[in-house]
């Protein structure tokens, strides 16, 4: 279990990056509060759930102040019988006019028994704001895999490169090369040949 609450003051800019490679059940709660005008927060997450594990991720970005910005990017992979649930909450409070709150989540499922769920929620108490969410959950498109294979890749390589394209924005924020290598090794392990 991991719980992180942050507050952004003034013109502060806070980025929270979480990569969950835990081989077990997990519950992660991330909350970012922008409490003064002009603050900005970005939350980026990546999670892999396999075997029969259940991963729950709750991300809550709260605009308390006017002209503040909150961004959320979540990426997940489910394989075997793993379950992945992402609750993304964008919350623009009364008085936070001129604010932005955006979220984007993509979940890829590799196996029939794996499940991924994304539950975006926007709570808006103010006018004159920009708020949106985008969500994609499902298997990798077979036509995309076919196209990449027609260019010389194996199905496993195609899945790996597609997965990496989603993980890359999260990995770019990690300065520890050993952690980046762990993510790549884990992806190699969970992506099976067809």
Segments from the language model and where they lie:
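Conserved beta-strand/loop scaffold segments within soluble protein domains that form the structured core
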Residues: 1-146, 150-153, 169, 174, ...
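Well-ordered alpha/beta subsegment
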Residues: 149-152, 156-159, 163
